[in-house]
A protein has these predicted regions:
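Short acidic/polar inter-strand loop motif in beta-rich domains
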Residues: 117-125
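Residues immediately within or flanking Cys/His clusters that coordinate Zn2+
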Residues: 6, 25, 113
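Short, aromatic- and glycine-rich surface loops/edge beta-strands on solvent-exposed regions
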Residues: 108-118
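Short cysteine-rich clusters marking metal-coordination/redox-active sites
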Residues: 9-12, 28, 116
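Cysteine-rich micro-motifs
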Residues: 22-33
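Short amphipathic, basic-aromatic surface patches that mediate peripheral association
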Residues: 63-71
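Short Cys/His-rich "knuckle" micro-motifs
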Residues: 18-22, 36-39, 124-126
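Exposed aromatic-hydrophobic patches
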Residues: 62-63, 98-105
């Protein structure tokens, strides 16, 4: 799969994933959206970087080597698995555990992204 890019609107907070990058940044609320760069916010890596376990046809993700808080004001909104054939996203809610399991066919997992509502986008590349 091509390089995955996410953008956020600095005005309203909308987030989009670039499906086909033709070189033009997306617009929202009358202005250019800002690219979300994984790990660019000064925050605890041990609570944000996805901890990934790969097994035959499955990827288990725990957000953080130390569980990320899942409170009404601070939580992981979603986790996304990127493979060589596409991607899978799961949404989380406050109060839930910050872990998910993805089941897939004969695809090769490439990376996992996690989005914190306060500290932005985080990524772990799978070797």
């Amino acid at each position: 799969m091509k390089n995955v890019k996410f953008y956020i609107c600095p005005h309203c907070g909308n987030i989009v994933e670039m499906v086909n990058d033709a070189g033009v940044k997306p617009f929202c609320c009358g202005q250019k959206m800002q690219e979300l760069v994984p790990g660019s916010v000064d925050a605890s890596h041990e609570k944000h970087v996805p901890d990934v376990k790969v097994s035959e046809g499955a990827v288990e993700v725990n957000v953080g080597s130390v569980n990320h808080p899942m409170e009404e004001v601070h939580w992981i909104e979603w986790v996304q698995l990127v493979t060589d054939k596409g991607s899978y996203r799961k949404w989380l809610n406050p109060g839930e555990a910050p872990n998910v399991k993805f089941l897939f066919g004969e695809e090769k997992p490439i990376a996992v992204y996690a989005y914190c509502n306060l500290h932005g986008l985080w990524k772990n590349e799978i070797n």
